[in-house]
Amino acid sequence: MAPTTGPRNTKNAKPAVQRSKTLKRKRGQEELSSLIQRVEGLDLKESFESFSDLPLSEPTLSGLTSSHFKTLTDIQSRAISHALKGRDVLGAAKTGSGKTLAFLVPVLENLYRRQWAEHDGLGALILSPTRELAIQIFEVLRKIGRYHTFSAGLVIGGKSLREEQERLGRMNILVCTPGRMLQHLDQTALFDTYNLQMLVLDEADRILDLGFQQTVDAIVGHLPKERQTLLFSATQTKKVSDLARLSLRDPEYVAVHETASTATPAKLQQHYVIAPLPQKLDILWSFIRSNLKSKTMVFFSSGKQVRFVYESFRHMQPGIPLMHLHGRQKQGGRLDIMTNFSQAKHCVLFSTDVAARGLDFPAVDWVIQMDCPEDADTYIHRVGRTARYGRDGRAVLFLDPSEEEGMLKRLEQKKVPIEKINIKANKQQSIKDQLQNMCFKDPELKYIGQKAFISYVKSVYIQKDKEIFKLKELKLDEFASSLGLPGAPRIKFIKGDDTKQRKNAPRAAAHLSSDDEAGSDAEEGEPKTKKKEEPQVRTKYDRMFERRNQDVLAEHYSKLINDDGTMVAPPNAGAGADADEDDDFLSVKRRFDVGDETLGMSSDDSDEEDDDDDETSPKKETKVVHIDGKEALVIDSKRREKLLKSKKKLLKFKGKGTKLVYDDEGNAHEVYELEDEDQFKARGDAKEQKAKFLEEEAERTRLADLEDKEIAKQKRREKKEKRKARERELLAEAEDEEETVVQLPPYEGDHDMDGGFSASEEEEEAARPSKKPKVKFAEPDESDKGSEPWYKKSKRTDDKGGSQAPQIQTLEDLESLASGLLG
């Protein structure tokens, strides 16, 4: 038997658990106080080499160790110590130097030392200029903060706003983009930032520029002023206005590479190529074909260019995977592209500046800048996608000859070393003919190419640095031809300067220039006056014939350019031109109303009369049409004038129609004609009229029945006569088809002594064919006279006895039949 156990002492177990919790809480308080003392005694001038040298909490150190972060970079060593002390920091370092950890570690530590919990609200807010960078920051935060008890959230566009609103009030750390954050601050009722401790701006110079200025100012207005602010970027701003907007308090500027000879990583090889605008795509195609075993990023100025180059190169199949990334894509697709490009070994990514800042793509070999960046800072961020964390990298910048001098001057001011290289002409391949062929076959690709051309020209036009971007020196017609387009699309804003000149020009000069442009019309003495065309009334039939495909071949596509370089006129313009041509033949010179006194007048008299009318009556009389059953219809618009041509629409302006019936005398009466009460009473009592009406109706019904019966009887009689006539016709046809029986001529030939046929007759008998002719019918025998016809007898025999009479074909058959009948 198993030993019996006594009752458990529950009274002693509960205090033991309480004592362990108390000891654990006490030990945690001691560690926290020790950590606070270490932070307060931290020497800011001291250099640190590893994370373990810093006064960090155990959960943070465990997360860093699990994520394989051990050694500190220069920016991390200097910025983390200042941030742990609670100071505002402006951090500037080269791309790929580890700025993300430089602000994430202080965020975790400062909240940990304050014993931040879920109910304390939002403690840290991290702003990022792009969604991709926000996602990357959030992933790093999850890795190093896995052992903390904080709740962190990612708030970016492209996701459900309601789901974010439900969870936002429980978050301690938020990584977000400015636009979505401001939306929650304005619309989410339970979201409050009164207890915010830290504000972090990654890529601060981009967030503080004109693109995010109003949004960031609105966000800062919702935040408390007593907070710690951290700003990090590869190209940090020092503007007093920007720093004042964020309410920085004696910020510490940490620029670890300020004294360095270059602003870019040391292992980054930077080159530029003089590539005329029409030859850029040829050079890019040749480069991709020559580097199929590398990982390349290609930057463009606009998303339309990215899409056009991706679609066209994808059809030509260069032999390497192609991807494209721009801001117009859905958030899920952008994440998939980022993941696939990060995992790929050999790939080409066409992108806009959405991927130029902060994104960490591993092992990028080449960074190609097809279009000149807007400034040197953008160039630094673009080339920063390669040569990260001490790796090798190469960057190539394509410059038009008009952009070379100004861009090199800007790069020199930023300490960017760059060398010029030349392209071997024998290795350059032209893809102009292929692009033209694809644009001819695929109208959608042609449309994308036109949009790419327009977006590039706009991006050059809006640039502020006119020393670099000189729009008038670009060969736009040749550039459009290199894209495969039949001509350069017209862009309105290019003529902005000419518009200003025309506006400021004297009116006399403008009048003279307009007279010169009039040409032959002015010489013929016809004054050229411009009148605003009134919009024509378009019916549903006009819309039906003007209907077009609802794809990219819409009206705005056809307006871009014709193949001959002229603008495409709107649909109504063509219709009006055709109408003008048609009016030249049999056009109405003048319309006369009924009773017009000028109908018989000559042209001169009528002209004089018109002049008098114009002087006396300044207003044109309104046409009025009188319609039966309704009030007059006033024709005061073209729509009302077209209304007269539609019978269906005129029905509502007319009275209700009446249907008439005519009696035997030809008098018209309505279908349902009612009589007065006096007329009804004059004909007698109502009961008598009722009885009389029933008698009349009964008599009328009886007569109608007799007539119907006679008609039915006549129809049956006619049907019977037709049937008998048909039988007689069939019998006559049967008699006509009967054939007479063949009778042999009397025998006259010689015969032998035995009474048989001679030898010649036997030979003739043997020579007869074996098949005998058919005889369908035979003549009746003499013995059958007075009896039934033979064909009836045979038919009756067949019906009763089931045996059919033998068919008579020859004389022997007839004799055998006769002998059988005779007995």
Swiss-Prot record:
Ranges spanned by the short sequence motif DEAD box, renumbered to the chain: 202-205
Keywords (A to Z) from UniProt: ATP-binding, Helicase, Hydrolase, Nucleotide-binding, Nucleus, Ribosome biogenesis, RNA-binding, rRNA processing
Biased composition (Basic and acidic residues): 525-545, 616-625, 702-713, 776-801
KW Plastid (keyword) present: no
Gene3D superfamilies given in the database record: P-loop containing nucleotide triphosphate hydrolases
Record-annotated disulphide pairs: none
Gene Ontology MF annotations: ATP binding; ATP hydrolysis activity; identical protein binding; RNA binding; RNA helicase activity
Occurrences of domain Helicase ATP-binding (ranges): 80-254
Protein localization: Nucleus, Nucleolus
GO BP of this protein: rRNA processing
GO cellular component terms listed in the entry, alphabetical order: nucleolus; small-subunit processome
Entry EC no(s): 3.6.4.13
Subunit structure: Interacts with the U3 and U14 snoRNAs. Associates with pre-ribosomal complexes.
Name of the protein described by the UniProt record: ATP-dependent RNA helicase dbp4
